[in-house]
Amino acid sequence: LMTDPTGFDEWHILPGQGIYYNPPMIHNGKKVKHEGYTTDLITDFSLEWLKKRDPSKPFLLMCQHKAPHREWSPALRHLGHNGDKPFAEPANLFDSYANRGLAVRDQDMSIEKTFTETDAKLKAPGSLTPEQKKQWDAYYEPRNKEFEKSQLSGSDLVRWRYQRYMHDYLGCIKAVDEGVGRVLDYLDEAGLAENTIVVYSSDQGFFLGEHGWFDKRWIFEESLRTPLVVRWPGVTQPGQVCNEIVSNVDFAETFLDAAGVEVPKEMQGASLVPILKGQTPADWRKSFYYHYYEYPVPHRVRPHEGVITDQFKLVRIYAPEEPYFELYDRKADPAEMKNFSNDPAYAETVKMMTAELAKLRTQLDVPAETPREAFGNRPLE
């Protein structure tokens, strides 16, 4: 956020993305330095507020974690959580990007090209206390020395980085899991669980080596899909699964609807309350629109837009080169390794999806030309 939160009675936020260890945070406008692991601190502040709130009033708590954002630094207690057992590699860790356009090849978010010494934990964070640094060094230093001694290159280096990445990323997730458990336990202990809606989600997905990548941004499945788990006693049924197309633009309308507040007409999502009740509206969306702008930094992911249905995904990559399309069949090719846009067997599908993209652009009032300032503050290349 470029501004302080508004409309909240109390808030703790990280400046920018924040740091993992001993972070400064902004509490109701005042910057305060804390000692501890950021995921634990965010959980602590959430529980403190729950315990001191006015119990006679309804509440909304947003417990939003930094983890597992880059650079994926685990809690020190979780270093070595997997016992150094290797993680399975995705089948397309060494994607050649055959049959696809320039954009997927000319990016800057690959484990091979973009992974830094900080990402790989070859350098310790500067915010650690001396005692924390000892714990950090006890785990990483012997392994880093072994890595430096081995002089890895090529695919062997990519594989080593992938294993380090997965250890650290999943180590971050362990602390998030623990924090979620603490909040749910408190709701049970305080007798609030039966009258509280809990929504677990994320702002985006993430590549864990698929296509050789880390990070997000792309319209591809690993980045596009997010978790969405809802507990609403008396409304959602345990084990209930929804396969409808939903989006994080639906969240605000859902919260307002559940609270009995009128939804502003300018909002572009839709309330999920009927779906959560098992009553999907007959006119629920069958497709949705995606648009990514930020270019060339970070990561050189070209501006692109697209439309997604239950089976197909049409992508239009439009800058800085001349626009071109790619079509993916999500059922025939779930890993999205083949572009079907020039396959005669998919000609009608391309036509249908192009029309759907145009319809959604009109419906959402997307400008005919993307404003230059949407791309960021660097010149297009």
Whereabouts are the PLM-identified features?
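Short glycine-biased active-site loop of nucleotidyltransferases that positions the nucleotide triphosphate
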Residues: 1-5, 217-219, 281
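Short, structured coil segments at secondary-structure junctions
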Residues: 6-7, 78
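C-terminal cap/loop subdomain of S1 sulfatases and analogous C-terminal strand-loop tails that border
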Residues: 7-10, 71, 204-210, 237, ...
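Active-site-proximal cap/lid insertion segments
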Residues: 14-36, 51-56, 62-246, 258-266, ...
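A Trp-anchored, charged/polar loop motif used as the substrate-binding/catalytic surface
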Residues: 38-52
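Alpha-helical elements of the RecA-like P-loop NTPase motor core of helicases
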Residues: 44, 325, 338
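Short amphipathic alpha-helical coiled-coil/interface segments
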Residues: 353-357
